Amino acid sequence: MAWMAASSRIRPAGLRRLPGVLLLAVLVLAGAVLAGTGCSAGSRPAASTAPRAPAVAAAARPGPAGRYLALGDSIAFGYRPPQVRPAPDYYDPADFTGYPEDVGRALGLSVVNAACPGETSASMINTRAPSNGCERNAADGPGYRPSLPLHVSYPGSQLGYAVGYLQQHPDTRLVTIGIGGNDLFRCQELTDHCRGAVLSQTLAATTANLDLILATLRGQAGYQHTLVVVGYYAVNYRDLPFVHQIEALNAALAGPAARYGATVADMFSAFRAASAGHGDDTCTAGLTFALPGGCDLHPTARGQQLMASVVERAIAPVTAW
């Protein structure tokens, strides 16, 4: 969800996000970290400016079971907010690991993680479409990708990269896609509570975009192996208005998944069950980050591990590699 980060405004039940000030906070933090090395945020040492992410043609060697391409937003990216300790190194994408890396290790797959914090279902298709902080933030300022490195570098859209990657790597055996959370957050940011007809219109667009994304992966990219649509969880399951929005989002994702033979990884039920003994609060359960003033919606290492286990269970009946 921006799937990106947190703002100074506390959302219902402690839900926090940071569409407009995330990048500023991240760059200030990065500058503070670099101050001890005599460098500014804009003058990273030469040894660290070399591209870390491979191009499509130079992707990692396949693991024993093949390749795994992860697509999505900040959750798949493994984003951690700047307030956590130890502070993340935003100039080093290897400092961020999410459920894709856990899944890859468990299944013996080499992972290429193309996720971008703040990606929406529209910006995944077209970089000029509104994002929630990947290319641009909600205030139309520069986003994450123009300013900080992703796990893998690519010039166009995330979907465009996926098509090229899958065409060049037919030994790819797993693709996961977690997208749509930032569609909901943009709706919350730009409208009054994102409900009723406005919510329905937002989710209809999400469904249409995911339809196009999955059709492109199956058609143009020619990918016919295991495909997983990763659902979303609630932060606090006692916050019924937000719970209902997440349920509606997951329902919007389920239709395209079924149409294109994708398995759905049910994060909503998994996080609800795991937080049941903690007041139905994922933050109290240690699944999302507890920050001063509220709960950040991004998963902790424990939360990412839970997500990985849900993905692994979801694909167990359909994997054949």
Residue ranges with predicted function:
Residues 67-72, 76-78, 110-115, 173-178, ...:
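Structural recognition of the beta-strand scaffold that forms the well-ordered cores
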Residues 232-321:
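Catalytic His-Asp segment of secreted/periplasmic serine-dependent ester chemistry enzymes
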Residues 181-182, 191, 213-248, 269:
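Active-site segments of SGNH/GDSL-like serine hydrolases
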Residues 77-81, 129, 133-201:
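Oxyanion-hole/transition-state-stabilizing segment in secreted/luminal serine hydrolases
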Residues 55-67, 102-105, 154-175, 213-220, ...:
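Short amphipathic alpha-helices and their capping/turn segments at secondary-structure boundaries
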Residues 48-134:
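Serine-esterase "nucleophile elbow" of acetyl-processing enzymes
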